[in-house]
Amino acid sequence: MDGKKCSVWMFLPLVFTLFTSAGLWIVYFIAVEDDKILPLNSAARKSGAKHAPYISFAGDDPPASCVFSQVMNMAAFLALVVAVLRFIQLKPKVLNPWLNISGLAALCLASFGMTLLGNFQLTNDEEIHNVGTSLTFGFGTLTCWIQAALTLKVNIKNEGRRAGIPRVILSAVITLCVVLYFILMAQDIHMYAARVQWGLVMCFLAYFGTLAVEFRHYRYEIVCSEYQENFLSFSESLSEASEYQTDQV
């Protein structure tokens, strides 16, 4: 990969992945240090520990809950930005827009779920927290499959297979983790369920980090223009639009 030919926007998905994963592990270590949860490598519950090391339990009590809320809010914002930029990136390249629109909607709903589970702690409002968890995991998984399909279909810079196959594999692993997580939860095997949950979240974050592959080819700009009180005619509008129409935003 030639760094001189890479857009700075490639770092956005990487920052999202690294920031969120680091923040969640900080929450985990704070909760373990305060003896709120068991360490992930514990074989059995020890005296004084309250819960299995689920992420929701790790971020349930201050000071860990304060960090958890901030991490999830920032993650939701970055995920929303990634969703919009990815939609714009693929918009001129797909013939049938429904799949691209579905990918945008799914990731937006997953981002909204992140804010719910981050700001409504489990013991304070379990119902809303669980709704946020369902939105995040459910629409997050759907997003992964949609983006994997779009990657193979659009084939940006002939890198569709190189980026798409790992995404299909990650999507399958994520789906398997979601199913396994709920099975273990139903059987009250909480230590293993918590480990699966952490693995699931790390796979999610790794998946979105792979979007840097396509983002490195694109440059995004925000264009600000002065409001014109007198509207241009239709022909003038088309003429002006043709001057600025590019594949870049």
Curated annotation (Swiss-Prot):
Main location: membrane
Tissues expressed in: High expression in the epididymis, pancreas, dorsal-root ganglion, eye, brain, and spinal cord. Expressed in muscle spindle afferents (at protein level).
Reported consequences of knocking out the gene: Deficient mice exhibit loss of coordinated movements and abnormal gait.
Extracellular side: 31-64, 119-130, 190-192
InterPro entries reported in the protein's UniProt record: DRAM/TMEM150_Autophagy_Mod, Frag1/DRAM/Sfk1
Keywords from the UniProt entry: Cell membrane, Lysosome, Membrane, Transmembrane, Transmembrane helix
Keyword match Cell division: no
Segments in the Cytoplasmic topological domain: 1-9, 86-97, 152-168, 214-249
GO biological process assignments: cellular response to mechanical stimulus; proprioception
Subcellular location: Cell membrane; Lysosome membrane
Gene Ontology molecular functions: mechanosensitive monoatomic cation channel activity
Outcome recorded upon mutating A49K: Affects ion selectivity
Transmembrane domains' residue ranges: 10-30, 65-85, 98-118, 131-151, 169-189, 193-213
Catalytic activity: Ca(2+)(in) = Ca(2+)(out); Na(+)(in) = Na(+)(out); K(+)(in) = K(+)(out); Mg(2+)(in) = Mg(2+)(out)
Membrane topology term: Multi-pass membrane protein
Coiled-coil regions, chain positions: none
GO cellular component: lysosomal membrane; plasma membrane
Physiological role: Nonselective cationic channel with high permeability to Ca(2+). Component of a mechanosensitive cation channel. Confers mechanically activated (MA) currents with slow inactivation kinetics. May contribute to proprioception.
PANTHER family given in the database record: FASTING-INDUCIBLE INTEGRAL MEMBRANE PROTEIN TM6P1-RELATED (PTHR21324), TRANSMEMBRANE PROTEIN 150C (PTHR21324:SF7)
Family to which this protein belongs: Belongs to the DRAM/TMEM150 family.
More info: Tentonin comes from the Greek 'tentono' meaning to stretch.
UniProt-recorded name of the protein: Transmembrane protein 150C
Organism: Mus musculus
Organism ancestry: Eukaryota, Metazoa, Chordata, Craniata, Vertebrata
Gene of this entry: Tmem150c
